[in-house]
């Protein structure tokens, strides 16, 4: 075999390697638009977030990237949470059962899709090689415009969307929203639009000024004193589910 034949065979083998086919296609839901946008092939996250057609059309901190495997797992986790809430409600005392029912109703119609653990900040991923994973296969990107609300959820009255205001703390948002029976009196979990979680201490003895960014979810969970042992990690499970929802 001469050198030319060897070079040709080597070139063909390289093209046929998995690396050569390591590309993804992304279906994008843009805010306020009826039709989706398809982007691809893209090799990695940087190629996705720097697409010219996406510039100024979305708010990257609120974007969520998912695939079929992540969605399937998130839906399974969500169904498990809802089943546990229903079982606990049937066993609980009347006042706590009413709180559990309220929480179940709040979570009933969530649009759960899963979230891949990737950063989507264009400025960040372009300079951090470790935050630029390859994209292989089919993905979905959900996006939003910059929000003007936060969402209050959990064992609290008046749950729902509240106007976001710069400088307001989690404690400020809880004003005029009394806790329900069995609520945690010490901490609130802040779920940022990026899916990150921050504990906000809100009791007199541990209060700390925590300002949630726009688009955050504030989860006021169940007190550890009312959670049965078999549901001891239910708050954590619910928070995990809330990080997997399609952004509003």
From Swiss-Prot:
Keywords, comma-separated and alphabetical: Signal
Family membership noted in the UniProt record: To E.coli YjbG.
InterPro entries named among the record's database cross-references: Caps_syn_GfcC_N, Caps_synth_GfcC-like_C
Organism the protein comes from: Escherichia coli (strain K12)
Signal peptide: 1-22
Protein name: Uncharacterized protein GfcC
Top-rank lineage group of the source organism: Bacteria
